Regions:
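Short Gly/aromatic-enriched secondary-structure transition segments
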Residues: 78-79, 83-91
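Exported/periplasmic cell-wall-interacting domains
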Residues: 104-262
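N-terminal post-signal-peptidase region of extra-cytosolic proteins
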Residues: 42-61, 73-75, 92-103, 110-116, ...
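C-terminal motif of bacterial Sec signal peptides marking the signal peptidase cleavage site
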Residues: 15-18
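Bacterial N-terminal signal peptides that target proteins for export
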Residues: 1-7
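Proline-rich, low-complexity linker regions of envelope-associated factors in Gram-negative bacteria
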Residues: 227-432
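Post-signal peptide N-terminal segment of mature Sec-exported envelope proteins
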Residues: 25-52
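Bacterial signal peptide processing site
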Residues: 20-23
């Protein structure tokens, strides 16, 4: 009897452990779930929430890192700092690294997005779904378009971030509970990769570098504060944690007079020194080398075995880190020229694509930045830096940085009027 009891406990522990990193190999069967919308988070997750000094209904934030195929759930602790509570291996994402530009390009969005209860879709044909909110105000101001870009189940993607059904059941539950607790919007941060010095140096030759440098400012702000940055858009670019004296943000118009809270400036300055040293070291490591970013087909080939015996719609994609490779710059240039010629010969209409493969170029809507320094130089975007660690930043810096008072949300489609009595976020910084 005792042996049976222990066996049951062991099996239960195995299933519960599948809630996070192990779902790639231990895929739970959720066909028995009748009420998926209200299906509760597992006891093991609730125990971890309590252990980390969080409340079940406290706010959450979602982070996505395309290259390694990771989706993270961060949750507010009782001290208003956020800590990672869960991590999932994304089952499928389409396209390559880089932002979504237009309908049909198969690209999954990159940027900062605002999710509300209206973005939850309990009736999705892909089990459950959360709309990413693409296009946001930045995307619209830059002429980018696309519809129905989701985080959903079923492990099949055409511009979405697709999870297993078991994973989306849990992710949906995190969002549902946070909204029940009063959170108005959940910030989604979608990055091409963890924006460390190592990764920025490795991707320094990408045509998307200027866009990524801009995203990195928001990444750095979170790494320092462990709070979702307050995001706005002006002059067709993102700005983060900026205080204004009565000016309003307009995505396509000139930025209002604004400034960064002094405490945040100090913290970011210290952070940047660490980053610069790490970047200099990484540049020496990658001198004369270039990173080849694999195609979707090349990533799918890595996990072809997983599709055997499964329904045709099941279409996992492998890691871009595993499918990509480091090459000598001369070899990389030759490979890009060969691919460009193949594209040109297959369709004259794709000449522009071929050209972009031959010569990486900065985004037309972003200011050019020196290749030697991956951090954006524009002061209005709170240029900052990332520590040398290759994983998520947990270096203790946040403990010394004051927390913004207001709930720092990503932007919505139309910026709401701010209530006069609402406490400005920078006042909290001055308090400590």
């Amino acid at each position: 009897m005792r042996l049976t009891h222990f066996a049951l406990l062991a099996c239960t522990a195995l299933v519960l452990s599948g809630c996070n990193d192990t779902l790639e190999t231990v895929e739970r069967d959720v066909s028995h779930v009748k009420n998926k919308v209200d299906y509760p988070l597992s006891p093991s997750i609730l125990a971890e929430i309590d252990k980390k000094n969080m409340d079940r209904t406290s706010p959450i934030m979602i982070r996505i890192f395309k290259e390694e195929g990771a989706l993270e759930i961060w949750k507010a602790k009782r001290d208003n700092r956020f800590d990672k509570i869960a991590e999932y291996q994304i089952c499928a994402w389409s396209g390559k690294l880089g932002p979504k530009v237009k309908e049909g390009d198969r690209q999954a969005p990159e940027g900062f997005y605002n999710l509300t209860p209206a973005h939850l879709n309990p009736n999705s044909k892909y089990y459950l779904a959360i709309n990413t909110g693409f296009p946001n105000r930045y995307d619209a101001a830059n002429g980018r378009n696309g519809t129905n870009l989701m985080i959903h189940g079923a492990c099949s993607s055409s511009g979405c971030y697709s999870m297993t059904d078991a994973q989306i059941l849990e992710i949906y539950g995190f969002a549902r509970d946070a909204f029940k607790g009063g959170q108005k919007t959940v910030q989604l941060q979608a990055f091409p990769f963890r924006m460390t010095a190592e990764n920025m140096a490795r991707h320094r030759q990408s045509e998307h570098l200027d866009f990524w440098k801009m995203l990195k400012v928001g990444y750095d702000n979170f790494e320092v504060t462990k709070r979702p940055p307050e995001v706005n858009v002006c002059e067709k670019k993102y700005v983060f944690n900026q205080q204004t004296e009565g000016g309003a943000f307009n995505a396509s118009a000139q930025c209002p007079a604004m400034s960064t809270p002094p405490a945040l400036v100090s913290a970011l300055s210290s952070y940047e020194k660490t980053y610069d040293l790490a970047y200099e070291k990484a540049m020496k490591k990658y001198d004369g080398m270039a990173w080849y970013d694999p195609s979707e087909a090349e990533r799918k080939a890595l996990v072809a075995e997983k599709r055997k015996g499964r329904e045709p719609a099941y279409a996992p994609t492998g890691s871009a880190l595993k499918a990509g490779k480091l090459m000598k710059e001369t070899e990389y240039a030759a490979l890009m020229e060969k691919k460009a010629q193949q594209v040109t010969s297959s369709s004259p209409a794709t000449t522009a694509t071929a050209s972009s493969l031959r010569t990486p170029h900065p985004s037309a809507t972003q200011p050019a930045a020196p290749q030697s320094n991956p951090a954006p130089a524009a002061p209005t975007m709170v240029a900052a830096a990332t520590p040398a660690a290759s994983g998520p930043g947990q270096n203790g810096t946040a403990a010394q940085v004051p927390v913004p008072a207001m709930n720092p949300l990503a932007f919505s489609a139309a910026p709401p009027a701010e209530a006069p009595e609402k406490k400005p976020f920078w006042k909290f910084w001055a308090k400590e």
